[in-house]
Swiss-Prot record:
Family that this chain belongs to: Belongs to the bacterial ribosomal protein bL19 family.
Chief location of this protein within or outside the cell: mitochondrion
Transcription regulation listed as a keyword: no
SUPFAM superfamilies assigned: Translation proteins SH3-like domain
Subcellular location: Mitochondrion
A Pfam entry, by short name: Ribosomal_L19
UniProt keyword annotation of Ribosomal protein present: yes
Taxon lineage: Eukaryota, Fungi, Dikarya, Ascomycota, Pezizomycotina
Residue numbers spanned by region Disordered: 235-258
Designated gene of the protein: img1
Source superkingdom: Eukaryota
Official protein name in the record: Large ribosomal subunit protein bL19m
Amino acid sequence: MNVTASLSRRPLGCLKAGLCQSLIRGYATAVAASTTQSTGALPDHNFFRIADKHTKKTRTAFAVFTPPKSPTTLPPSSVVTKSKAFKIANSKLPPLMTKPPSDPMPLLTQQQIARMDPTGARTALFSKARHAARVGDVLMVTHRRGGEPFAGVCLAIRRSGIDTAILLRNHLGKVGVEMWYKIYNKNVAGIEIIKRRAKRARRAKLMYMRQPKHDMGSVEQYVFAWKKMRKVLSSKGLTGGVGGGGGKQKGQESKKKN
């Protein structure tokens, strides 16, 4: 009696799980019935049809393009033949861009010198030619802003492009004075050669002339002689030379005496 009561009290959850598994297997193995519907029975959809207001005709919302009647052909001018391709290949191509210089400073220096010295007189005066100024010559620099010109012996010529400069030495009041002048400076009105050195110096810089043994002293006597000679030459040019102007003056004086 007690055994049957205990069996009747057991839960039935295991039976529910077994029944669910059998139902799932039946659904998986069952053959689905094919339901075919005739196309004629389907309703005609009018979703993409639009009625024209003027002609009252229906038109679809999609654009329909008809195929061209004849295949598209290119114009004869656009067709590239072998002869035309050969002519194009052998035609002169435009010149390529020149390669920029690796060092643009020399070109810039030349442009600056051409702007500061358009005639090229100062560049030729301090070039390495024979007729150019050398170290040891007596030079005179005239300022553009007025004042007394400075004359002295050229001790050195520093050639460095647009910054080319000369060093002049003179004595003012028994005191040695040296001045640097840039030849391309706008404030320098002119540079004159007062006296040339008799013999070419062996050195590029005559710094030994600062010593009392080799010091040239004041150059005022050379400047005075140069100005006197220049004045004589200018007076001869105004009077028409020695043979012309002098003869006329003598003739006028003889007439006055008579």
